[in-house]
Amino acid sequence: MLIYQDVLTGDEMISDAFPIKEIGDIAYEVDCANIIIKEGDVDIGGNPSAEEAAEALEEGAQQVNNVVHSFRLQSTSFDKKSYLTYLKGYMKAIKSKLQESNPDRVAAFEKGAQDFAKKIVANFKDYEFYIGESMNPDGMVCLLNYREDGVTPYFTMWKDGLKEIKI
């Protein structure tokens, strides 16, 4: 099993237990689902059926995103200006990390990140924002959006902001 950690904070952000698709060698899209948890339930990474979401919530139960719940991601908020300020600093930090660990990747990262950031800004209103469990403001901000059906959630995460840990 692979766990993906934020390279800046060490927070666990995702694992390969969730479907992960690489987007343009710059980001990952991670499919997720809204699940119902009850007080005392233990989530072992199973993927509940889609019909379960339609059931009424029992007392003490709540509907949560399985990635947010499994990795204890914390909701945060941005307006466009503050997100762009954050993103500029984050990209600089990731570039610095890449220069230490993988200097050959820097040029591709800069080009890909610039293009991908334009897509994010163009669809800014569609995103919800999450940060790692430590709530470190310097870490990665994961972007939650919904597929064209308006129901299926997915996260977008910067590929170079994650490191694989084999467990």
From Swiss-Prot:
Please indicate which superkingdom the organism of origin belongs to. Answer: Eukaryota
Q: Which InterPro entries match?
A: Mss4-like_sf, Mss4/transl-control_tumour, TCTP, Translation_control_tumour_CS, Translational_control_tumour_p
Question: Keywords on this record?
Answer: Cytoplasm, Cytoskeleton, Microtubule, Protein biosynthesis
Q: What is its main location?
A: cytoplasm
Q: Name one GO molecular function term.
A: calcium ion binding
Keyword Signal appears in the UniProt entry: no
Domain TCTP, by residue range, is: 1-167
Q: Which GO terms describe its cellular component?
A: cytoplasm; microtubule
Protein biosynthesis listed as a keyword: yes
Alphabetically, which GO biological process terms does the record hold? translation
Protein's cellular compartments: Cytoplasm, Cytoskeleton
Q: Which family does it belong to?
A: Belongs to the TCTP family.
- Record function comment: Involved in protein synthesis. Involved in microtubule stabilization.
PANTHER family, sorted: TRANSLATIONALLY CONTROLLED TUMOR PROTEIN-RELATED, TRANSLATIONALLY-CONTROLLED TUMOR PROTEIN
Its name, as the record gives it, is: Translationally-controlled tumor protein homolog
Upper taxonomic lineage: Eukaryota, Fungi, Dikarya, Basidiomycota, Agaricomycotina
